């Protein structure tokens, strides 16, 4: 059995998957903040409960926001302060007497989608998250591609390409990102960026769901905004896809629920790619809230 943990600032979610990658059981508990010991206990107790329930010693994978293992072997996860700065992988491996694998939550999202029954035919899968921020991950032959700093797939911190300024105007503001850089695409393509663009052009403060509702009602201003956003997304993806050249692009995050993104993006991409390049198949993420657990569990699938 494959145990997958999706750990965040508020909850620890465990999903148990069988050899056919089907969810057999899940349980959630609040994320302990009092101490590292309490955090370790919460994870180990869930593993013990799963072992007893299924009568096997399952493999353990964990998806967590941040950098799963820094140079000195410790976790960096600002949203999980009880475990941040601690050697989480080594400590859990010792306590559970098995190989515990960690990766960041965006990589786990991409891995979950790459192992979808319909998507396993694609060797190189790119996951793109358009949510509160912009991120993602890459999966090659069923395994996540993880660089030395765990920043593979941090697409949101690529800067606006020159073609974006041609589209938006050379007086378009380069916003300062939380990472300290100017013009990161996350500030324009995330859910918050979607709303900011609307406010910038129309001087109205609306959230993304409100703008999308207007678009669905046929509002001309919302329609023009969505067209501009999709053009900007295509420009930025043109650079990324030229580097990555994936077989499949899976889009997740809150904005993936807006069908225009997956249905209208493909027709815009070719003009931003090399003439010989083929645009990837584009699909909306299939596994929703279970994706984090699935991807974490599947860190052990290619053994």
UniProtKB/Swiss-Prot annotation:
GO biological process: N-acetylglucosamine metabolic process; peptidoglycan turnover
Metabolic or biological pathway, per its Swiss-Prot or TrEMBL entry: Cell wall biogenesis; peptidoglycan recycling
Gene3D superfamilies recorded: 3.30.420.40
GO terms, molecular function: ATP binding; N-acetylglucosamine kinase activity; zinc ion binding
Keywords: ATP-binding, Carbohydrate metabolism, Kinase, Metal-binding, Nucleotide-binding, Transferase, Zinc
SUPFAM superfamilies: Actin-like ATPase domain
Residues noted as binding ATP in the record, renumbered to the chain: 4-11, 133-140
Signal sequence bounds: none
A UniProt-annotated Pfam family: ROK
General function of this protein: Catalyzes the phosphorylation of N-acetyl-D-glucosamine (GlcNAc) derived from cell-wall degradation, yielding GlcNAc-6-P.
Name listed for the protein in its UniProt record: N-acetyl-D-glucosamine kinase
Source organism per UniProt: Salmonella paratyphi A (strain AKU_12601)
């Amino acid at each position: 059995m494959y145990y997958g943990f999706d750990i965040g600032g508020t909850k620890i979610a465990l999903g148990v998957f069988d050899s056919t990658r089907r969810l057999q059981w899940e349980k959630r508990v609040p994320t302990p903040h009092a101490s590292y010991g309490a955090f370790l206990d919460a994870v180990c107790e869930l593993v013990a409960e799963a072992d007893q329930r299924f009568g096997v010693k399952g493999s353990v994978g964990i998806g967590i926001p941040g950098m799963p293992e820094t140079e000195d072997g410790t976790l960096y996860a600002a949203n999980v302060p009880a475990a941040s700065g601690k050697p989480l992988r080594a400590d859990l491996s010792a306590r559970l007497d098995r190989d515990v694998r960690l990766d960041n939550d965006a990589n786990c999202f991409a891995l979950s989608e790459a192992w979808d029954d319909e998507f396993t035919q694609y060797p190189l899968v790119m996951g793109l998250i358009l949510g509160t921020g912009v991120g993602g991950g890459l999966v090659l032959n069923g395994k996540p591609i993880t660089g030395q700093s765990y920043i593979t797939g941090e697409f949101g911190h690529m800067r606006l390409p020159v073609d974006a300024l041609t589209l938006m105007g050379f007086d378009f503001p380069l916003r300062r990102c939380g990472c300290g850089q100017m013009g990161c695409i996350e500030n324009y393509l995330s859910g918050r960026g979607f709303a900011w663009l609307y406010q910038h052009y129309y001087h109205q403060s609306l959230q993304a769901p409100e703008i999308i509702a207007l678009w669905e009602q046929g509002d001309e201003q919302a329609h023009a905004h969505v067209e501009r956003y999709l053009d900007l997304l295509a420009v930025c993806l043109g650079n990324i896809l030229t580097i990555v050249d994936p077989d499949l692009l899976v889009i997740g995050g809150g904005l993936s629920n807006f069908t225009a993104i997956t249905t209208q993006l493909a027709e815009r991409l070719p003009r931003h790619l090399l003439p010989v390049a083929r645009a990837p198949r584009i699909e909306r993420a299939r596994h929703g809230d279970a994706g984090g657990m699935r991807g974490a569990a599947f860190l052990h699938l290619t053994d």
